[in-house]
A protein has these predicted regions:
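Acidic, surface-exposed loops and disordered segments
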Residues: 1-104
Length: 104
């Protein structure tokens, strides 16, 4: 995060929706995919239920950005131009034994 060229902080108003976590997660996923389609590197940095030193990550970020108490931190999406692109995994490299069909 420290060296990211850009970061998007995604917060949700817990007083407006009981599904704010899901809404924020969908927004994060869509931005993550869009960045990739544009050739921009991105990384999902989980913020909710995480700690930063002596306080929660949410408290740490809130102190710096000043968002209201009813808004809760979901995550931070960092953006930048990637140095290199990792090759995709081949199908035979994937742990297919972890896939269950119809029953666990």
């Amino acid at each position: 995060l420290k060296e990211a060229q850009c970061a998007i902080v995604v917060i949700g108003d817990e007083t407006e929706q009981d599904v704010w976590i899901e809404d924020c997660s969908v927004a994060m996923a869509n931005m993550h995919l869009m960045a990739s389609s544009l050739g921009i590197g991105s990384c999902w940095v989980q913020g909710r239920l995480r700690n930063a030193d002596e306080k929660t990550t949410e408290e740490f970020v809130r102190e710096r950005l000043g968002f209201p108490e009813n808004y809760k931190l979901e995550a931070i999406l960092t953006l930048g131009m990637p140095d290199a692109e990792a090759p995709a995994h081949q199908l035979d490299e994937l742990p297919m034994e972890k896939i269950k069909w119809e029953r666990y």
